[in-house]
Design a protein with these regions (language model features):
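N-terminal glycine-/serine-/threonine-rich beta1-alpha1-beta2 phosphate-ribose binding loop
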Residues: 5-47
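ADP-ribose/adenylate-binding Rossmann-like module
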Residues: 44-61
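Hydrophobic, well-structured mid-protein blocks that either form specific transmembrane helices
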Residues: 71, 78-113
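Single conserved hydrophobic/aromatic residue that forms the stacking wall/gate
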Residues: 1-7, 11, 206-211
Length: 211
């Protein structure tokens, strides 16, 4: 079958409907799937000693623990909730801002297409974790306030999800201070950025595997 690369060039490649049918040994596996499929891929990677780049999101805490404590000790794993370089920069920026705006109320708003399954997005949680770790892991994550009957606490961080249309991905982190606010936003207009980021991760992971 034919399929297009991120650069819009067309290549002929064998496509398998089951990972167990693959005859060649890959140098690195890239996983853009869903948590239920990832563990079959991890099992295959472990059995064949193949490094893996995991770009899938939606893992719960126990699944993440299994990946980190069981599989990562046996094979090289590069795992990220977002393959965008600019999201990495955003994470650094908001962490720095959090140290300077310690009295600010922090809210995160993420927007994605109507077909996205997990909520909130893995990227939103990653951004929240960056801020929380910077502030000593003292923040409470609040995902919905419809049942809240009290004033906002200064030890919480709000995380909100919006779903609609074909929006690829938008993440905003807002710092609310007295009489002013500061908002940092990252907006994705093409999924090509994820492919480029994944290929950079492949290069890094492959080199690590051969150190």
């Amino acid at each position: 079958p034919l399929y297009s690369s991120a650069a819009s060039d067309v290549y002929k490649r064998q496509v398998y409907d089951n990972i167990e049918k693959i005859k060649e040994k890959p140098d690195v596996i890239i996983d853009f799937s869903n948590p239920s499929a990832t563990f079959n891929i991890l099992k295959y990677a472990k059995e064949n000693i193949i490094p893996i780049v995991i770009a899938t999101t939606g893992f719960n805490d126990s699944e993440t623990k299994i990946i980190n404590e069981e599989y990562a000790k046996l094979i090289p794993i590069f795992k990220s909730n977002n393959m965008s370089y600019e999201i990495s920069l955003m994470s650094e920026i908001i962490s720095n801002l959090a140290t300077k705006l310690k009295e600010a109320d922090i809210e995160i708003i993420e927007t994605h297409h109507r077909n996205k399954i997990d909520s909130p997005s893995g990227t939103a949680l990653m951004l929240a974790d960056s801020i929380n770790e910077t502030l000593g892991n003292k923040l409470e994550y609040v995902y919905d306030r419809h049942d809240k009957k009290n004033k906002r606490s200064n030890t919480e961080i709000g995380i909100h999800s919006v779903r609609g249309g074909t929006e690829v991905g938008k993440h905003s982190v807002i710092f609310f201070s007295e009489d002013e606010s500061l908002e940092i936003t990252h907006n994705v207009t093409s999924r090509r950025i994820f492919a480029r980021g994944a290929l950079k991760a492949v290069s890094y992971t492959h080199l690590r595997a051969h150190e």
